[in-house]
Amino acid sequence: MAKKSMVAREKKREALVAKYAAKRAELKEIINNKELEMEERFRASLKLAKLPRNSSAVRLHNRCQLTGRPHAYYRKLKISRIALRDLGSSGQIPGMVKSSW
């Protein structure tokens, strides 16, 4: 299990990303618009820099929904390889059987 504080920190980051996503997208669109004046684009980049650091989606890290483990994460299932193995062994994932050859 991951530390509770790390899982809580990640949830807080997810909330910040969701809160500022629209504002970030709007500012990035202004910055990347070559038709606007350079001064206006520069002001937009300063506003973007003033937003909270944790509101950037790049700072998010995928974590297992069951254990909070940050490594060996399967995106489709949203769980780690260890949680997948445990669930598969106990028969809680339909169609998953232990392989033998």
Curated annotation (Swiss-Prot):
**GO process terms (BP):** translation
Q: Does the keyword Acetylation apply?
A: no
GO MF annotations, alphabetized: rRNA binding; structural constituent of ribosome
Q: Which GO terms describe its cellular component?
A: cytoplasm; small ribosomal subunit
Stored SUPFAM superfamilies: Glucocorticoid receptor-like (DNA-binding domain)
User: Which positions carry the signal peptide feature in this UniProt record?
Assistant: none
Q: Which UniProt keywords apply?
A: Ribonucleoprotein, Ribosomal protein, RNA-binding, rRNA-binding
Protein family according to the UniProt entry: Belongs to the universal ribosomal protein uS14 family.
Q: How does it assemble?
A: Part of the 30S ribosomal subunit. Contacts proteins S3 and S10.
Q: What does this protein do?
A: Binds 16S rRNA, required for the assembly of 30S particles and may also be responsible for determining the conformation of the 16S rRNA at the A site.
User: NCBIfam families, per this entry?
Assistant: PRK08881.1
Q: What is this protein called?
A: Small ribosomal subunit protein uS14
The organism encoding this protein is: Roseobacter denitrificans (strain ATCC 33942 / OCh 114)
Organism ancestry: Bacteria, Pseudomonadati, Pseudomonadota, Alphaproteobacteria, Rhodobacterales
Report which gene this protein is encoded by: rpsN
